């Protein structure tokens, strides 16, 4: 069969009209990327770090949200502030006894929630954190708040892809079929019985799942290692819009935060 040209493709019945499909330009177009930064990322709450990463007065971390440089610092009174970063080039450190951020041209709304994570938004009139998460943390909130948490590992990677592609890998499970080890040992009835529960503002909670560690070759049950109030060997996961993942499994919590750098580049911070 000869290849179809544009005219022949236009004659194929059942074609979608413009507006009936999502263009692949959403992964590469610079103007779409800029619009996403302004209309999405400037209006959402982002967990920029954990309070344990700012243990003392003057300790700070820098980050960016929607291309805007942010400095998060703990002051003498133990309060944590998020301000516009106009002077600090280090990614983290201590500002010394003269903290001197009071003259910052911009303070951002911030809150410490859900296990001590420092959330920041550029939105000048934001919803409260509870309004923003809309109950999506109910599955793990009690476990995260039971005892003080501490970041014991940090990893950063820059991935050459659009941020939406990365978030998709945390949101779907069809790629599990490509993993031989998972095909043989990981699938059972409860794996497919999970329910994806959707919340306002684009968040999704993947239903609880009991991980059968003792079924993996070389592994054993982890019943003695578990977060408070979390059933033994259980796993909970929250995919938060537009690119945040809270993954609670047994005795460890992993949090992934995306920072889009360009249409084809995204930074992932793993804690």
What do the predicted segments below correspond to?
Residues 78-112:
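Long, hydrophobic, well-ordered secondary-structure blocks that form the structural core
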Residues 13, 18, 92-95, 99, ...:
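Feature targets compositionally biased, intrinsically disordered low-complexity regions
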Residues 73-79, 108-271:
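C-terminal catalytic domain of Rieske-type non-heme iron oxygenases
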Residues 6, 11, 16, 20, ...:
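Generic preference for well-ordered secondary structure
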Residues 54-56, 65, 101-105, 150, ...:
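Short solvent-exposed loop/turn micro-motifs enriched in small/polar/acidic residues
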Residues 1-86, 110-111:
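N-terminal pre-ligand scaffold of iron-sulfur
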Residues 42-54, 91-95, 237-242:
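Short Pro/Gly-enriched beta-strand edge/turn motifs at strand-loop
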Residues 11, 15, 102, 212-215:
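Residue-identity detector for glutamine
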């Amino acid at each position: 069969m000869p290849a179809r040209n544009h005219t022949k493709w236009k004659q194929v019945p059942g074609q979608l009209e413009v507006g009936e499909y999502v263009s692949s330009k959403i992964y590469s177009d610079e103007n779409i990327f800029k619009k996403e930064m302004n209309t999405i990322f400037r209006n959402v709450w982002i967990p920029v770090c954990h309070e344990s990463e700012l243990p003392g007065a003057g300790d700070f971390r820098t980050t960016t949200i929607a291309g805007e440089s942010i400095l998060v610092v703990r002051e003498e009174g133990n309060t944590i502030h998020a301000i516009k970063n106009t002077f600090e080039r280090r990614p983290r450190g201590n500002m010394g006894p003269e903290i001197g951020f009071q003259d910052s041209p911009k303070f951002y709304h911030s809150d410490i929630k859900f296990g001590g994570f420092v959330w920041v938004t550029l939105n000048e009139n934001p919803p409260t954190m509870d309004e923003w998460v809309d109950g999506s943390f109910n599955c793990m909130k009690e476990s995260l708040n039971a005892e003080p948490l501490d970041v014991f590992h940090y990893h950063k990677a820059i991935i050459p892809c659009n941020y939406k592609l990365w978030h998709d890998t945390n949101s779907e499970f069809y790629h599990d079929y490509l993993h031989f080890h998972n095909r043989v040992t990981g699938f059972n009835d409860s794996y497919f019985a999970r329910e994806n529960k959707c919340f306002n503002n684009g968040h999704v909670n993947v239903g609880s799942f009991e991980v059968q560690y003792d079924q993996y070759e070389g592994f054993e049950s982890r019943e003695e290692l578990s977060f408070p109030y979390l059933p033994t060997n259980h796993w909970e996961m929250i995919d938060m819009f537009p690119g945040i993942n809270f993954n609670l499994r047994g005795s460890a919590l992993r949090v992934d935060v995306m920072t889009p750098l360009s249409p084809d580049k995204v930074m992932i911070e793993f804690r």
